[in-house]
Amino acid sequence: LTFSVTAILFFAAAVLVFLDTFFAFGAGQRLPFFSLTSADLAGFILPVFFVLGGVWALFCAMGYAAGKPQQMGSFGAGFGMTIGMFLFCIKRFVASPTSILRIMPTLDILSALAVLLLCCAMLRAVYLPRGASEEKHLFLFGLLAFLFGTCFTGAKLAYLAVTGSLSLTAGADLPLVGLGLVGLAVALHAVHTDRRRPARYT
């Protein structure tokens, strides 16, 4: 279910970000390459990776529903999703440098970083043999992604919607909310798997 929701949020984000950039470009606005609060030229690139992320989430949803392992054919979409999250993270670093006095931009950057770490951990767990400490990494990165991606970003989007300041640019945050939910599911599954593993004595 979480992968299905994430796929929908990825596709919605791709449409919203592209429309925001297209309308701003069509209106003759001078667009920077990276911007945090307005349209930018990266809005023509990010939607491609968001679509790949949605496709990968759909593959995962169908695979888990059928009880089958993921095929290597879906690795390209997952890799594209990770590249997109990396680009999104770089965008936030460049467009909003961190400082102690700028708490919200710092939390935005931490949200992107947490989700990027989760994407890397999930790719390794899905397509490579799992090591003994794999569940610990999935648990840690999953909870971090849920805390920053779903709890913080979701609350921020809700606040923007209530105050009437929500814009199409904020659509780029939707994948963070979805991947945070996936992170929570991954963390809970990692705990369940680790408990079923027999104890090791030295």
Question: Language-model features: where?
Answer:
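C-terminal transmembrane-bundle signature of multipass membrane proteins
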Residues: P105-T202
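Short helix-loop boundary/capping segments
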Residues: F75-M122
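Membrane-interface helix-boundary motifs at transmembrane edges
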Residues: L1, M62-F75, V126-K136
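Alpha-helical transmembrane segments of polytopic membrane proteins
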Residues: T2-T6, L36-V55, M104-L116, L168-G180
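Hydrophobic, membrane-facing alpha-helical anchors
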Residues: Q29-F34, F49-Q70, L87-R92
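Juxtamembrane "helix-exit" motif on the non-cytosolic side of transmembrane helices
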Residues: V15-L31, C89-I100, T153-G164
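Transmembrane alpha-helical segments of multi-pass membrane proteins
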Residues: L1-A13, M72-L87, K136-F148
